[in-house]
UniProtKB/Swiss-Prot annotation:
This is Peptidase T. Belongs to the peptidase M20B family. Binds 2 Zn(2+) ions per subunit. Cleaves the N-terminal amino acid of tripeptides. It is an enzyme of class 3 (hydrolase).
Length: 409
């Protein structure tokens, strides 16, 4: 586990927040800066085929150290952090041997409380890395990067651990849904892969949401308020009417497990035009289609009731549930389970209430389930990770490489 924490702390110091309003890839220059750093580290580890392409994708390969044929496996993590909270000037703090109670985040009023985050009660005695309460931490997904590189370094330093080819990929812009857009599966060279992008220890995921974005555009008419009678149509009022037509019990804060939702994620209001940005999620493809039909029906209903003004709906499919692409390859899941069990980690198979690069890659011909990092509360200032969880992830990655080699002897 040499240098694992040091690597992680180094990577979170890079500002790599992605930006959905930018069309180029990567969407922010900071991701290229981190990519250059990772490329240099992989070269220092004497990996082969190390490459940073013009779109910010980093790839490399640890060659097999066995004579028999073993399918090449891939390990993937993303370099960007979520736009939901600042990732600039991250100041991690390490709480050693956590003994319970609130953890003060920096010098402000923010705390990490076991009342609000009960998972903390399971982590007594652990060493926890938190934020200072002003930014996210970046464990999503820089912990995955640190764990992959540490595992590869361990395999390099211990040639007695047998393994086949291991392909490494670090992607940009995952948090804005574009991480797989320009990923070259053929060049990557793996038969299957794992994203190291999950949460608490034991998570193993090969199901994710089907996802659609829904832009509701409400059109009004702007007139000077002093002469607006019978002329002005305030699009914000139309937008408010639409939001009130949506089911209040089918939102992220009211759903769990396999339940889908509608989520109003953004608003751009003005009198003349208001844009509502929704995301629609459902684990069942048919359920997603029904949700899209429901939203269109509400748009039609609202339009029919308006004497002035109008509403339009733009639906864009983002990604689909990888289960249909991964299930035919059950050995991929079984190998991950065996690796976890061999490391005294109980596999916790659950659906991802979100998406990963692996979801898209699975539909591009690279089956790609998701493995834990040891982190919690991603995308916000209460994000944290345990050092022990990170170490477990490294052990599982190493064991996964070893188990794959053994299986194909």
């Amino acid at each position: 586990m040499d240098n694992l924490v040091e690597r992680f702390l180094r990577y979170v110091s890079f500002e790599t927040q992605s930006n959905s309003s930018v069309t180029q890839c990567p969407s922010t220059s900071g991701q290229i800066v981190l990519a250059e750093q990772l490329k240099n580290e992989l070269i220092e580890l004497e990996l082969v085929d190390v490459e940073l392409d013009e779109n910010g994708y980093v790839m490399a390969r640890l060659p097999s150290n066995v004579e028999h044929d073993v399918p090449a496996i891939g390990l993937i993590a993303h370099m960007d952090t979520a736009p939901d909270a600042s990732g600039k000037d991250v100041v991690p703090q390490i709480v050693e041997n956590y003994q319970g109670g609130d953890i003060a985040l920096g010098i402000g009023d923010e705390v990490l409380s076991p009342i609000q985050y009960p998972d903390l009660r399971k982590l007594l005695g652990h060493n926890i890395i938190t934020t200072d309460g002003t930014t996210l931490l970046g464990a999503d997904n820089k912990a995955g990067i640190a764990e992959i590189i540490t595992a590869i370094a361990h395999l390099k330093a211990n040639p007695d651990i047998k393994h086949g080819d291991i392909c490494i990929g670090f992607t940009p812009d995952e948090e804005i849904g574009r991480g797989a857009n320009l990923f070259n599966v053929e060049k990557f060279g793996a038969k299957w892969a794992y994203t190291i992008d999950g949460g608490p220890v034991g998570e193993l995921e090969f199901e994710n949401f089907n996802a659609t974005s829904a832009d509701v555009i409400c059109h009004g008419v702007n007139v000077h308020p002093g002469t607006a009678k019978n002329k002005m149509i305030n699009s914000m009022n139309i937008a408010a009417q639409f939001q009130l037509m949506m089911p209040t019990e089918e939102t992220p804060e009211c759903t769990e497990h396999y339940e889908g939702f509608y989520h109003l994620k953004s608003m751009e209001p003005s009198v003349a035009k208001t844009e509502l940005g929704y995301i629609i999620r459902d684990f069942d493809r048919k359920g997603l289609e029904q949700r899209k039909v429901f939203m269109q029906s509400k748009v039609d209903e609202l339009n029919s009731s308006l004497t002035k003004g109008r509403v339009e709906l733009i639906l864009t499919d983002c990604y689909f549930n990888m289960r249909e692409m991964v299930e035919p390859h059950q050995h991929i899941i079984e190998l991950a389970k065996e690796a976890m069990i061999a490391c005294d980690v109980k596999p916790d198979i659950k659906p991802i209430r979100g998406g990963t690069d692996g979801a898209r890659l699975s539909f591009m011909g690279l089956p790609c389930p998701n493995i834990f990092t040891g982190g919690y509360n991603f995308h916000g200032i209460h994000e944290f990770i345990t050092i022990e969880g990170m170490e477990q992830a490294v052990r599982v990655i190493v064991k996964l490489a070893e188990k794959t080699s053994e299986k194909y002897q």
